[in-house]
């Protein structure tokens, strides 16, 4: 039937998201950060069109919802965790921290754990049909991918203390499950009229992409997150 065909189309796109996420994991484990970011971006594109198809075709199913969450936790939870894990392994550890150097990299998997919690929360939260509460997992993954790929040399230098990275992991893990309302790029369709704010946001992002290149994703996500934090300080 037509309805079943629409569901299969959506699930195919979800599987492409998962496939790209698996490749991102391999690239991250091999410390090929730019390639890992590339496949996370590809996963986020598939995830975007997955949601767009679901809304445009009304192609919703219980299996599709579960499959989407599983794909997202690999692409946007495990992949960025492996990026940060590999980075921790490369970082300079002062003599006073040598005892913790073999163990600290595993803190990177807090990203996977809190991404799974965020996805489970999202699946059962009726407030998030048109906007987000807490940082979306694709945004978190793009932040880590672009930060590490764009500022790798600085992050592995003696000027960057591993504790700073650990604090950042904890902060963004908390943002994933926080009660802070966040901007959403959910498109109902591709018309300007129905998605004016989202299109304007994308246009504003262009200068970031031009001037900051790979690091632009991190800069955009930090800027948006900071804006929401300031706007909702009472939540803190």
Please describe what each predicted stretch is.
Residues 1-4, 8, 228-236:
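Single conserved hydrophobic/aromatic residue that forms the stacking wall/gate
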Residues 52-61, 116-128, 177-185, 229-230:
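C-terminal ends of transmembrane helices
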Residues 13, 39-40, 107-110, 114, ...:
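Hydrophobic alpha-helical transmembrane segments of polytopic
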Residues 21-28, 50-57, 79-84:
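Generic transmembrane alpha-helix signature in multi-pass membrane proteins
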Residues 25-37, 82-106, 147-164:
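Helix-coil boundary and interhelical linker segments in multi-pass alpha-helical membrane proteins
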Residues 129-230:
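C-terminal membrane-associated helical module and adjoining short loops/tails
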Residues 5-48:
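Topogenic membrane-insertion module of multi-pass membrane proteins
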